[in-house]
């Protein structure tokens, strides 16, 4: 039986005629790790370009391939200006788009960052990089692409700091797991008698072990008076085998755990300084909270409640279930401009 010819790659001319070009000076860019394919409006005037190695010898004059070095990014911006492009659409692929986006925005282009799923869902999408950038350009010129949400530039800086801070916490957590592993390999049952080994009792005992203390009775005396287990029970749990290789692993893991917490404190100082620059004018200080609680291991080292109040003008921690750490992360991701969503229902839908 003869195969039916597919018409998926050929747009219906009747439908195409009904679509109006809304962005006549739009370009489309297909972003990759090693190359960037750029398509400007067909008919845009530009100087001729010789094909780069590995690039098809026959390319439409409005399509070019660039590398991803900084000089290549500047070359893209120069070509777009030459072609009188004012707005550029690209997919948010990994982190490869960030340097080009920053450069284009800083040089006056309007950049439309698009969720890749939006472009993929559009029918008739081609499968090659050469055609992909043309497809993005065409969709953008017809006004069929919607910008992905991005907070304002100061908020994006804050978001980067917060995400880096989360990575530091994750790295510190890995070394805490290695501390627990080394203790278990020496049959030191500290986690069984102390609910949180990063607390006062747990860390006092671990640091004493690293300093050379092996006597279970002496180690048990380091327990905090609020510890539920008795000194005798803790002493029995601390009768370890003390193999040198596991002691060495414990020593190094503790040093790395401390190092990442030092980096956390440095990160907190940078975040606090950045929040000072985001503060609204003439916002009165909050009254001190009556709640008294012990500071948690990974909490920020500055008064986040006050800083957030100066940024937003309201006390976000007054919302039930919202603590300082939660408010810091959420606000750094979405910013303070709630007008981006028509209503709280739209905001909730965007959150998923």
Name each region found by the language model:
Residues 1-352:
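A detector of single, family-specific signature residues
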């Amino acid at each position: 039986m003869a195969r039916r010819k597919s018409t998926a790659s050929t747009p219906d001319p009747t439908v195409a005629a009904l679509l109006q070009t809304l962005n006549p000076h739009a370009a489309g860019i297909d972003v990759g790790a090693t190359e960037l394919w750029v398509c400007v409006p067909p008919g845009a005037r530009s100087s001729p370009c010789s094909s780069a190695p590995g690039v098809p010898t026959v390319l439409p004059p409005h399509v070019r391939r660039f590398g991803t070095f900084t000089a290549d990014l500047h070359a893209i911006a120069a070509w777009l200006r030459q072609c009188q492009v004012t707005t550029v659409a690209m997919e948010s692929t990994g982190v490869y788009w960030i340097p080009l986006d920053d450069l284009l925005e800083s040089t006056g282009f309007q950049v439309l960052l698009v969720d890749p799923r939006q472009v993929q869902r559009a029918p008739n999408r081609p499968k090659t990089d050469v055609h992909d950038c043309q497809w993005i350009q065409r969709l953008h010129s017809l006004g069929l692409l919607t910008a992905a949400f991005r907070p304002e530039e100061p908020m994006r800086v804050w978001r980067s700091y917060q995400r880096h801070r989360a990575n530091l916490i994750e790295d510190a957590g890995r070394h805490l797991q290695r501390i627990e592993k080394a203790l278990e390999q020496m049959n030191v049952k500290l986690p069984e008698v102390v609910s949180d080994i990063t607390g006062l009792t747990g860390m006092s005992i671990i640091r004493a072990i690293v300093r050379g203390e092996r006597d279970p009775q002496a180690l048990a005396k380091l327990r905090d008076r609020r510890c539920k287990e008795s000194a005798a029970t803790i002493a029995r749990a601390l009768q370890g085998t003390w193999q040198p290789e596991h002691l060495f692993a414990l020593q190094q893991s503790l040093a790395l755990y401390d190092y990442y917490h030092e980096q956390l404190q440095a990160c907190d100082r940078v975040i606090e300084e950045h929040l000072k620059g985001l503060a609204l004018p003439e916002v009165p200080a909050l009254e001190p909270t009556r709640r008294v609680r012990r500071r948690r291991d990974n909490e920020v080292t500055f008064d986040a409640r006050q800083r957030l109040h100066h940024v937003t003008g309201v006390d976000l921690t007054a919302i039930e279930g919202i603590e300082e750490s939660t408010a810091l992360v959420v606000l750094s991701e979405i910013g303070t401009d709630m007008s981006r969503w028509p209503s709280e229902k739209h905001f909730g839908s965007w959150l998923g």
